[in-house]
Amino acid sequence: MTPPASRRASFLPFAVTAATALLVSATATPAAAQTPTQPLSAADNVEVLGIDEGLPAAFGAAPAKESLADSVIEDVLGLRATELSTLDAQDRDVRVDIREATDGAAFGVAIVTAPEVEGEDPYAWLFAAELDGAVWSVGLEGTEEFSEILADSSLLDTEERETVAASADPNRISAMAYTGVGLPFSIGTSMVMTGGPHGFSGGPPYSSVDFAGGNGQARAARGGYAYSLCDGWTRVIHDNGYSTDYYHLENYQWLPGNNVGTGHYLGTQGNSVCAGGSSTGAHIHFALRGYTDPNAAGWYVALNGLTLGGWTFVEGASYGGYAYRNGVGTVYPGGWMYNYGF
């Protein structure tokens, strides 16, 4: 093994000349001159958005916004077991959007975008963070840390904070025996199921269904707190251990945490790809996420065997499968589906 440069002089022969010693000394790189590690937030495939207000004026050697973004990115990379360089090679970016900050805590959205090609999907989380000494502690939506940090903070309005923290806590709420979730259009109306169960994040679980036709309007499948993740992608966190995603929306209503009821207008079917992925033909990409399901762990939930809008879904090949309702019949991709509610 070759000793480090700073220790090489002690291994030179005793009769070394002064000139040689000076040469050896000159080749050693002083610690202070070494290139510092680049912050994650400075990477070419990272974008940091949102507010500065409410963050500390200074935070050690790095700006508070950069330091917070670094901690959020580190959690995202850890949860997805990946690296920024790997995401960059996949043409994926990371966005950190800081929405609110107060009293040493912060709340926002973290997104990993997808290339705009078929079969690639983005993924996103709400996050909560708090100052812990000289470090930001971060919790991503669906983790115990998220719920604990949010519940103990003064972020958001009191009712919103308490409801979202409890609803997204994997330990505090048991999922209901049925999903208690409808379909992404008005109860008592119909749309065409253009795509059967398929993935939202590059493969299984098959958590998503595509709808089009009808009056074209996307509406909340159950009440809850609605968050615009980007301009065309909404997530509604419900009170029963589930949340629902609505993607590709146009004529979009921006919702920064509004308490919405079942059937609340979210936008219209479209081809928006605000976080990447692809869309062929205007539609609503509708997906189910779970917090208390041990198989979901705050992630997308397989629809196979679950009932939404009065229909029980059965998966097959991606975008295939079907849905059935006893006494009514079976709907395959391309068929009309009536929303019976829940």
Residue map of PLM features:
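Secretory targeting and sorting signals
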Residues: 1-34
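Short, non-transmembrane alpha-helical segments in secretory-pathway proteins
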Residues: 52-95
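Exposed beta-strand-loop-beta-strand "reactive/processing" segments of non-cytosolic proteins
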Residues: 93-131
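Short beta-strand edge/turn micro-motifs at domain boundaries
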Residues: 124-168
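Surface-exposed, glycine-biased beta-strand/turn segments
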Residues: 149-233, 317-342
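Conserved, short, structured surface segments that act as functional micro-motifs
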Residues: 203-210, 258-342
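Short, well-structured beta-strand-loop connectors
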Residues: 217-228, 254-270
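Zn2+-dependent peptidoglycan hydrolase active-site motif and core
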Residues: 220-253, 274-283
